[in-house]
Structure formats: C-alpha cells, structure tokens
C-alpha cells in the first residue's frame, strides 16, 4: 500500500513539473491521480462506491475553478504555488490512507474538511499572488505564471488590465462624487471671488465718482462764495468812496439832504 502511494504521488509530482498549464484542474494527469487516490480510500464493498467517488472527485478537482471565477483578480497563480498545493493535498490523502476505515459518513466528513481547507488555502494564495502581480509597483514575478481561467502558462512579469481587479464601483462612485463636490466648491469660491472683486471695483468706481462730484460741487460753491464776497466788498468800497468824495467837496450826503429838506 505504501509503495503504491509513493508511486502515485511521484507521478503526480512529475506531472506538476512537466507541462503544467494551469491551476489544479488544468492538469489531466493530476485529476486522474486524484481519482485513483480517492479509490484507495474507499473499500470495494461500500454501497454506491462509484457514485461516491465520482462526486468527491468532481468536488475536489473543481475547487480551483470555483475559487478563480469568483473574481477575475483570482485567476493568476504561480506554478510553484500550484505544486505546493498539490503536495499539501497529497499529504492529506496520505494521512487519510493511513487511518482505519470508519465508515462512509466519516470519510465524507474528512474529505469535506480537506476541500474546505484546500479552498481557503487556494483563495489566500491566489489573493496574495494577485496583489503582488497587479501591484502598481509592478513587482517582478519569478517563474512561470498560470492563468486559471484558460490553463495558459505565461512568463509575463507584470500584469494589468483584464488580469487585475477592477476598481470597486462604490469606490469609483465615491471618487466621482468627491471630485464633483470639489469642483462645485471651487466654482463657488471662484464665483464668490469674482463677485467680491466686481463689488469692490464697482464700489471703488462709485466712490470715485461721488468724490469727483462732491469736489466739483464744493469748488463751484466756493467760487460762488468768493464771487459774493468780492461783490459785497466792491459795493462797500464804492459806497465808501462816494462818501469820502462828498465830504471833500462840501456836498451833503443823501442822508443830510433828506434831513435838510425835512427841515
């Protein structure tokens, strides 16, 4: 039994190293080895053995497809990581093969636990690798890379576009809303500045016009006042000159003439 396990897993390792084209289900040799290993876990006398093996084989080999198609960012995986996962799965099958047969329900529970652990490990490994492969720094990836969607083996060192996750729609929407609000705020600030500038310029022009009008008005009034003063002074000087001339010639003034006439 032990020699058979060694032989089967040796062929499994060789299949992993030679001609690996994709994730777990991408290698036909791997899927056949899983079927053989499952058959060694279930005795021949178990009822509906073939249906049980087919169901377990399908669920195990399709885990990679199940994980990869959840998100397009989960489609890339390094070949070395695929080999590690297969080695881990090999160890789990080997552990179950060394245990005593305890019935169909027990083996199904054990296989379910293996599938759940395999799915968790595969999801985490793919996420970690994709974050590195799709990083903005474009970190160099060593070794071949597998596209789990179409089982292609690539040597690309940096990945963009279809191989990387799109931006979260909510994040993009929030960014658009933020940019729109920033644009509105800038427009309001700019409009307020223009309006304030216009008000200040208009107020300044109005004040200049008012000062100019007031200055003109005051100058005009001042000229009128000066003219009135000059006119009054001229009349007084004229009357004073007449009085002096009458007194010198002996002619009575108008007031004296009236007084004499009255007498």
Curated annotation (Swiss-Prot):
Domain of life: Eukaryota
Knockout-associated phenotype: Male mice show impaired fertility and almost all of the spermatozoa show an aberrant acrosome shape.
GO cellular component: inner acrosomal membrane; plasma membrane
Signal peptide: 1-22
Cytoplasmic side: 198-263
UniProt tissue specificity: Sperm-specific (at protein level).
Residue ranges of the region described as Disordered: 241-263
Keyword Metal-binding tagged: no
Record's bilayer topology term: Single-pass type I membrane protein
Record: glycosylation sites: 98, 128
Any one GO biological process: acrosome assembly
Cell location: Cell membrane; Cytoplasmic vesicle, Secretory vesicle, Acrosome inner membrane
Keywords: Cell membrane, Cytoplasmic vesicle, Differentiation, Glycoprotein, Membrane, Signal, Spermatogenesis, Transmembrane, Transmembrane helix
Subcellular location, principal: membrane
Presence of keyword Coiled coil: no
GO MF annotations, alphabetized: protein homodimerization activity
Transmembrane segments: 177-197
Membrane side Extracellular: residue ranges: 23-176
InterPro entries: IZUMO
Role this protein plays: Plays an important role in the biogenesis of the acrosome during sperm development.
Quaternary assembly: Monomer and homodimer.
Family: Belongs to the Izumo family.
Note: Izumo is the name of a Japanese shrine to marriage.
Record protein name field: Izumo sperm-egg fusion protein 3
Species of the source: Mus musculus
Gene: Izumo3
